[in-house]
């Protein structure tokens, strides 16, 4: 990092950021300006500063690191950058007015992490790349939590966002399970997929009950449905006799649990949230 190229890019990025802050501090002056008006130049300067600083560090990682360590550092830095920007821009770009960019950035964070893990582009037994990817996962989780909290606090409970958040969280959970199994030397993900989905389904159901959220309970049942379909359509026919017996036992247990939930809790499962809070 101690080179002229890095220092120059870093200075340009910080200077651009400083100019954007000055525009915000003297907003009335720049609002009346002929050329450098506050709108849209303040937003452009902020985004340009973020892009320059991001490129500055990514270029250094590409130049001085190699292999799985380089891709891991780039992944962790990207995940951290998206989270930091979501937090740093909360006042300048309120989530009420810029909902789509926040939700898009949240989805991109999960997608970038998933592409890196599922791409099998790293050495599973190497400690440093593995730790970097777990750091990346931590930043992605923090990003999901922060944006979700801001959304629910400032905008309120909206079914489309809850569904979107659960899809991202489920995809992230499966990817983290895949990463853990790869680090443990397990290439096959069939069993891990089913177990991970089952755990996610139980968590969704528990949260749906505790938070009185009908949509979460329905999503949980959909998750269990995916597990059942996979067991019936794929796992059952690809296994030997003993494996089929185990699958039938698992199917029986899942169906028994779902039957119990429906018979004992059907009024709670499908009751409207408004009725539950009355």
Model segments located where?
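Alpha-helical transmembrane segments of multi-pass membrane proteins
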Residues: 1-278
